[in-house]
Amino acid sequence: MNALARENGTYAMVAMDQRESLRKMFRDRGFDDSHERMRMFKTAVARELAPHASGFLIEPEFLEHVQPFVPRGLIMAVDLLEQERGGIVEDTRLDEVERVPEGVVALKLLVIWRDDDRRRERIEMCERFVALAERHGVLSVLEPVVREDQQILAAARELGATRPSLYKCQAPRQGDVVARCREITEVVPVPWVVLSQGVPPEEFPLAVEHACKGGASGFLAGRALWTNTLDAEDPTELLRTQSVPRLNELIEIVDRYA
């Protein structure tokens, strides 16, 4: 796990593999959603944030553009998203890549967990994903996402059992959050980190604190770090003056509580 962890064994990672959801953010702000704008933004985030992080997540389409700016912990998404323009991710499939680019140290798979008749199918996909990463000699980062807050633990119990290298989990939002995070720690047999989807950026530091108090080992966050820069034609200055301090604040929280 040293390929993604910091010296003290914790994780402070940046997610930049958003696809249609990021395009929609650009459109909502009056910008075009072209490949060039996506490339520009993702490259800027990598250039400014990756040097401060222990890992950086990107999809294959933009990997070669960000790789020069990622000094360590390069994670490649291998999820194929079923997502209509402007909509949410409805489902995912595993892209069983035949080769992993040099420099990539981990693969990541997003899974939409539901309590339906396809649960066994999703478990098998996660098992294939873990085996795929092992076959390529890299780590596996599994990211199950649920629609209802109360489903987080069920998904963790079911899919954490496939034993990825690292489990990426939503932050519980209701009830005794620290106690709920302890329950996640009890059922997931591998280290886990919290993601920022669904959490307002200003509330994410507290979510990280609660998660780490409950046994999480850090975070893999995207929107909580860079959403505030989307209104700028060139996000560089805001990334430097707002996103980097925000990332460092989260790292301090992890160091204190993880």
Regions found by a protein language model. Give the residues of each.
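Alpha/beta catalytic barrel-like cores
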Residues: 1-116, 202-205, 209-218, 223, ...
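Alpha-helix-loop-beta-strand connector modules within alpha/beta enzyme cores
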Residues: 68-82, 122-142, 153, 178-199, ...
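Conserved beta-strand edge residues that scaffold enzyme active sites
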Residues: 113, 146-147, 173, 225
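Hydrophobic pocket-lining residues that define ligand/cofactor binding sites across diverse proteins
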Residues: 133, 159, 211
